[in-house]
């Protein structure tokens, strides 16, 4: 695994948010919200394998995000600050509670239900945001954990 860097400059971080918001304004139904990925990733500092497993009901209207970490098996209970909670509620409005918050268009072959996005897709999204923001450093999903963590 290669080492990735946090986003240290607040202006660059805000540019990334602006890019994610602009993308979301013109995204097609069923596409992943780039802004939601940034908001949840930055505010929970969870690994991408844990982020992608969140269901809408586990985030929307909640003061805490609770999850069993996939890598360590430990229970994690993370406070969601009021600003992040407002953004999460806005971004998940109108979505069904049992949907994945970061839902893929790919369906499970056995159940025919949508699956969460892969960590590779989350990485692609983060890199598209970073490149559009002019970030030259190596960026990845772990960047979200490192930025405020």
What kind of feature is each model-predicted range?
Residues 4-5, 70-89, 100-127:
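C-terminal catalytic core of Y-nucleophile DNA break-rejoin enzymes
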Residues 54, 91-94, 105:
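Residue-level signal for well-ordered alpha-helical positions
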Residues 44, 53-86:
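Conserved tyrosine-mediated DNA breakage-rejoining catalytic core shared by Y-recombinases
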Residues 1-8, 55, 138-141:
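A Lys/Arg-rich helix-loop hairpin that forms a DNA/phosphate-binding surface
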Residues 19-31, 97, 123-149:
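Short, basic (Lys/Arg/His-rich) helix/loop patches that form interaction surfaces
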Residues 30-40, 56, 80, 122, ...:
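Non-catalytic DNA-binding core/recognition domains of DNA-processing enzymes
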Residues 7-44:
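Basic, Lys/Arg- and aromatic-enriched nucleic-acid-binding interface segment
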């Amino acid at each position: 695994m290669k080492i990735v860097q946090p986003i240290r400059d607040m202006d660059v971080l805000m540019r990334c948010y602006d890019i994610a918001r602009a993308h979301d304004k013109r995204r097609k139904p069923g596409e992943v919200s780039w802004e939601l990925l940034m908001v949840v990733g930055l505010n929970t500092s969870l690994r991408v394998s844990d982020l992608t497993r969140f269901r809408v009901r586990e985030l929307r209207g909640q003061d805490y995000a609770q999850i069993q970490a996939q890598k360590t098996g430990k229970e994690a209970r993370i406070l969601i600050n009021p600003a992040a909670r407002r953004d999460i509620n806005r971004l998940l409005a109108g979505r069904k509670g049992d949907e994945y918050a970061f839902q893929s268009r790919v369906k499970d072959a056995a159940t025919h239900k949508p699956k969460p996005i892969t960590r590779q897709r989350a990485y692609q999204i983060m890199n598209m945001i970073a490149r559009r923001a002019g970030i030259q450093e190596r960026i990845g999903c772990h960047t979200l954990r490192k930025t405020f963590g």
